[in-house]
Amino acid sequence: MARYLGPKCRLSRREKTDLQLKSGIRAIDSKCNIERIPGMHWQRRGRTTDYGVQLRMKQMIKRYYDVLEKQFANYYKQADRLKGSTGDNLLKLLESRLDNVVYRMGFAATRAEARQLISHKAILVNGEVVNIPSYQVKPGDIIEVRSRAKGQLRIKGALELAQQRAPISWIEVDTKKMTGTFKEQPDVAELPAEFKVNLVVELYSK
């Protein structure tokens, strides 16, 4: 399945929540009517089945992290092999993707922009160039914007926008040096309350 290249607002409307796919320069509700599901024209929908609810939750989380269907399925398989809660493991794996960490640290306004920076070799991990967006960041890893990219206006703008977001406990950022440390495994309790990951586990357990 190819990556979705259509209107980002449409995806947020489909899931009835802000998937943080836009830069955040303007409030999401100023440009996107989240309550209106695309293509429905306000007509009443039929009763949603348990499977439908589970599928929607999977789609919401998959779109939030902007990963493809096959990637998401592989993350679930990996999470299921690890010790502990499969659902929590899944979210930790997704949160530890390099593109997500770059976004969380404020070096990019969106995860899509973070992927672009990584692909263009503008990001260092422990002093080495890493151009794989799905690279799994480990506790203690230091993420840095490459010297030649530090003057980019979009990165400076992203850092300003990041100040408006709630701080994340598992990362530490030096905005002046454009470096950050991935201190520890993500705390799933700090992730969006809408994420009912147990529904995803139920879906894949069938």
From Swiss-Prot:
Disulfide bonds: none annotated. The lineage of its organism: Bacteria, Pseudomonadati, Pseudomonadota, Gammaproteobacteria, Legionellales. PROSITE patterns: RIBOSOMAL_S4, S4. Part of the 30S ribosomal subunit. Contacts protein S5. The interaction surface between S4 and S5 is involved in control of translational fidelity. GO terms for biological process: ribosomal small subunit biogenesis; translation. GO terms for molecular function: rRNA binding; structural constituent of ribosome. CDD domains: S4 (cd00165). This is Small ribosomal subunit protein uS4. The gene is rpsD.
